[in-house]
């Protein structure tokens, strides 16, 4: 499989927010008696795991498919290019959030920023893939 396009975006704001929350939980845990401490430490660990899973978003386009994965690749998605009937560059509202979000009318995959590429699929579904290189990704998808 020949990769025609590949780009990784670091989720800086997400990392800073989640790791800061984990540090706050862990620091607060040491001020509490033992029973309450474990809940906060578990919360801190959960935030670190989520930060690791959503630390980046890598998007690649080959001659036949589009793939995207979060962080180390445990959350991985793919679709055939022939299933994409429309490609456009869009700007999301900050209210759409980050991560994997189901919004009215589309599903969003994003780690940082508001720019995205909207994909209209043959079956009528709409996907948005957030990226800081929306024009480059859209151009790679249009070259199919």
Positions of the model-derived regions?
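Short, small/hydrophobic-residue-rich motifs at membrane-helix boundaries and re-entrant hairpins
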Residues: 12-25, 39, 46, 50-55
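Short, aromatic-rich membrane-interface segments at the entry and exit
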Residues: 33-41
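Short, solvent-exposed secondary-structure boundary motifs
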Residues: 40-52, 98-102, 106-109
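Conserved beta-hairpin
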Residues: 44-86
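Non-transmembrane, membrane-adjacent beta-strand/coil modules in membrane-associated proteins
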Residues: 69-133
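Short, well-ordered, aromatic-rich surface patches in folded extracellular/luminal domains
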Residues: 141
């Amino acid at each position: 499989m020949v990769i025609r396009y590949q780009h990784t975006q670091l989720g800086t704001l997400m990392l800073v927010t989640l790791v800061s929350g984990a540090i706050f939980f862990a620091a607060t845990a040491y001020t509490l008696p033992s029973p309450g401490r474990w809940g906060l430490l578990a919360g801190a660990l959960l935030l670190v795991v989520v930060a690791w899973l959503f630390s980046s978003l890598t998007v690649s386009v080959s001659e036949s498919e589009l793939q995207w994965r979060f962080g180390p690749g445990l959350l991985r998605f793919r679709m055939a290019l022939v299933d994409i009937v429309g490609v456009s560059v869009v700007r999301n509202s900050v209210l759409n959030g980050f991560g994997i979000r189901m919004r009215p009318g589309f599903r969003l995959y994003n780690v940082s920023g508001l720019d995205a590429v909207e994909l209209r699929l043959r079956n009528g579904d709409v996907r948005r893939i957030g990226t800081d290189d929306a024009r480059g990704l859209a151009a790679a998808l249009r070259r199919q």
